Each structure stands twice: as C-alpha cells, then as structure tokens.
Design a protein with these regions (language model features):
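Formylglycine-dependent sulfatase
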Residues: 1-205
C-alpha cells in the first residue's frame, strides 16, 4: 500500500462519508450524498428497494466505457439486488465483474464474503475458499488480459470491512478481539495490493 501511495496518484484533499455504501455511491456517481440520496448504509439485496438506478445516475464506468475502455469491477457491490437485476453491473458500465453481491434475503449462503465466500463472477455464482483471494486473482487476470488496450479496474475491496475474523495467514491462531483482527485484515489487504501491483508491473504498464 505504501508503494502504491508513493508511485500512484494520491488525492491529498478529499471528502468521504463515514460509512460504506454512501461512500461508494458518491465515488461511482461523483455526487454528494445529499444529491444522490444514499445517506445511510443500505444493503439493497437484503432490505429491498430499487437500488442504484442506472436510468437516473451515470457512473464513471459508463463514461470511460463509452470512450473505448474495457471495464471491470472486483470487490463488493450491495447497491443493487443482482438476483432481481442481473444486468445491473453492465448497465452501470462494467463489462466484467467479480463481486460479493451482498447478503440476499432468503439466501443465507450469500452472507459470507470471507471464508466460504459467496462470489459472483460474470454472472456465475459460487462459494469459494476465501473471497478476497478469488476477487484479487480475477483483478490480476483482468490486468493481464487487457494490457494492450485501455482499461478501467474498479476495486472496492472486501477487506478490511467487518465481520471481523481470521485470514488465511492467521487462521491457525485466530485473533480474539477486533483490534487484532483488523490488524490481520490490513496485513492481508496489503499482500493483495502487492499482488495486483506485481501484475501491473509484469504486464509492462
């Protein structure tokens, strides 16, 4: 992560919402929360509703795709019910996806995002060993496959969001409190970011 901050583009003045879904909707749409209306955490797949309307909001992914970029999302979504709206990610501008769709009402297996994580890859749903590993492998592969054309990879990572627990690095001696678990999540997230940077380097980008 430190290397990414050093070599990448860093915004030193920025505003964010202090909670997850409003922040991601703001990032996707470029609008303040009081304009787009997402002012609280809202898990659409679990609680119902229409989710983020592509007929109302334009995401940055749609903008860059219209300019000829190949686009993908790797990470979490939660802001549409992808079981009821299976084309939502495409409508929002993503050609490819590998996401945890969010916990879906009536489908308890979808609540898991880490160990035995429930992941959706280009429409295919499956339970995987560890969700962040599957998503990161998809992200690295996307970079390799599209190194010779303009591309956008949007990566709203699962880590370091709760629920807190172990990672593959410390599962044999799992943390006993939130602070230790969070530290383990940060360490594992740093490892995944390193893998992605390596993929970018190996692609010659």
């Amino acid at each position: 992560i430190d290397r990414l901050a050093k070599e990448g583009l860093r915004y030193e003045t920025a505003w964010s919402n202090p909670i997850c879904t409003p922040t991601r909707v703001t990032l996707l749409t470029g609008q303040y929360a009081f304009r787009h209306g997402w002012t609280h955490h809202y898990d659409v797949a679990r609680k119902g509703g229409d989710g983020l309307k592509w007929t109302t909001f334009t995401t940055f992914a749609r903008v860059v795709r219209s300019a000829g970029y190949r686009t993908a999302i790797a990470g979490k979504w939660q802001i549409n019910n992808l079981r009821r709206q299976p084309d939502a990610l495409n409508q929002h501008g993503f050609d490819e996806h590998c996401v945890w769709p969010g916990a879906e009402q009536g489908f308890p297996e979808t609540g898991e995002r880490y160990f035995k994580g429930y992941i959706m890859t280009n429409g295919r749903r499956e339970t995987v060993s560890y969700g962040p590993d599957t998503i990161n492998a998809f992200a690295c592969d996307f970079v390799r496959r599209h190194k010779d054309q303009p591309f956008l990879l949007y990566y709203p990572m699962l880590l370091t969001h709760g629920p807190f627990g172990a990672t593959p690095l410390n599962k044999d001696n799992p943390p006993q409190d939130k602070a230790t678990s969070y530290a383990g999540y940060v360490t594992y997230m740093d490892r995944l970011v390193g893998q992605l940077i390596d993929a970018v380097d190996k692609a010659g980008l």
